[in-house]
């Protein structure tokens, strides 16, 4: 039990404003650097089948946003890399840790992707460390993201193995039920876990899960994240791959977790669930709104770029964000 560590989540934190130094919020720079590339926003749509597909990945890359393609179309990954490179776009894919993934990684030497994410639920594992070392040996120029983890020890071990960034978050997402099924996780204290892990990190941290509002992006950065992976806020768009369902004349999109039986195709070791989200507008509009809100956050922080968010003070007031209201 960690009695000496502050425990809080996104809804418990309010950031304290500083004097604004820009004339217009549009002057605020929301760009972020990851590896050798600069992206428009520090956000990543979750690498889940109901969030991203090849069409969305291509559009995000073309428009200057970072993405991670999911790993559930295994045979399609190599052709995907080739198509992205033919269009002079970055290729960012996911892999697991099963034996056949080693041969797959080795097969990419002639056309290596710029980014590979090792994507398993419990990333503090010998199998992940072994895969990191294999990727770095076979594809030394590829930026490796490893996860998911929830402790400083895990971050240090994965970094020492060669990971270029670590993904922090065990079960805080809206369609993840890890904490219910296993008793383990960062659900309910995800932001504190990000802070805890970031203090130990020498390389970028990606906060993954638990994001419910655009303001949570700024809070993630304040507590040490370089990038923020988001599921539910990116689900349910017109372009989203999730199946469309109509109920009483209203349209919904399916959104399910990567460890759900809908993803796995069987009821075994299930740690995810499926929900229906009212269909939103276009993904591009959500990205624009996220950028505008983050620019406002930077203006409140008294700065010109994301770095200013890391220096603001904050208060912990449990469950205070809505103050009895909702949006």
Swiss-Prot record:
Family recorded in the similarity comment:
Belongs to the IMPDH/GMPR family. GuaC type 2 subfamily.
Q: Which sites are catalytic?
A: 176
Q: Which GO terms describe its molecular function?
A: GMP reductase activity
Q: So what EC number does this one have?
A: 1.7.1.7
- Describe its function: Catalyzes the irreversible NADPH-dependent deamination of GMP to IMP. It functions in the conversion of nucleobase, nucleoside and nucleotide derivatives of G to A nucleotides, and in maintaining the intracellular balance of A and G nucleotides.
One Pfam match, given by its short name, reads IMPDH
Name the UniProt key words of this record, in alphabetical order.
NADP, Oxidoreductase
* Keyword Transferase included in the entry's annotation: no
Which protein, by its recorded name, is this? GMP reductase
Among the record's GO biological process terms, what is one?
purine nucleotide metabolic process
> Per its UniProt entry, which superkingdom is the organism in?
Bacteria
Keyword presence, NADP: yes
Q: Where does NADP(+) bind?
A: 205-228
**Gene Ontology terms: cellular component:** cytosol; GMP reductase complex
The reaction(s) annotated as catalysed by this protein in its Swiss-Prot or TrEMBL entry are:
IMP + NH4(+) + NADP(+) = GMP + NADPH + 2 H(+)
- PROSITE patterns hit by this protein: IMP_DH_GMP_RED
